Amino acid sequence: MSSQNQDLVVVGKLGATYGIKGWLKVFSYTEQSESIFAYQPWLIKVKGEWKPIQIESWKKHGQGMVAKLEGLDIREDAQIFTNAEVAVHADQLPALSGEEFYWRELYGMSVVTTEGYDLGKVTDILETGSNDVLVVKANLKDAFGQKERLIPFLDEQVIKSIDRTAQRIEVDWDPGF
């Protein structure tokens, strides 16, 4: 990804075409699914390149949503966007307070125990329903033989601090798990 694209945040994905007038199904990754339409323009990844496109209209359809993108007036024109990712520039996202952060900020951060043991780096975050879970890829020569750790994201109980500047998360966690 070029440095110009590093500030992009994927907020959804386009699905199959809907009808004959160029509408597409929309799958939102935003917390409130409809808020994906508050961001303009969308950047759509087609053949490896991000292209800006405006939303002409959108509506709920059954359990999901569909959108009409500017310049797509027939089904055949819209088909090229089937399964394409939808991104926006990171600076379009709402500002957060000092204690809040976006999950994307955690990726790549080092995870260290309160005793100073380096557990590895965050590679993914799982949503489990009760609480989110950090997926931490262990260092190659992990003293405990771990390749990956799943650490529950329980603020104060497990997660002791997050330092954006140092790119570090301090946890109260047994390195043997």
Swiss-Prot record:
An accessory protein needed during the final step in the assembly of 30S ribosomal subunit, possibly for assembly of the head region. Essential for efficient processing of 16S rRNA. May be needed both before and after RbfA during the maturation of 16S rRNA. It has affinity for free ribosomal 30S subunits but not for 70S ribosomes. It is found in: Cytoplasm. GO terms for molecular function: ribosome binding. Belongs to the RimM family. It comes from Photobacterium profundum (strain SS9). InterPro entries: PRC-brl_dom, PRC_barrel-like_sf, RimM, RimM_N, RimM_N_sf, Transl_B-barrel_sf. The PRC barrel domain binds ribosomal protein uS19. Residues 98-177 form the PRC barrel domain. One of its GO terms (biological process) is rRNA processing. The keyword Chaperone applies. One of its GO terms (cellular component) is ribosome. The gene is rimM. Keywords: Chaperone, Cytoplasm, Ribosome biogenesis, rRNA processing. This is Ribosome maturation factor RimM. Binds ribosomal protein uS19. PANTHER family: RIBOSOME MATURATION FACTOR RIMM. It holds the Pfam family PRC. Its main location: cytoplasm. HAMAP family: Ribosome_mat_RimM (MF_00014). Disulfide bonds: none annotated.
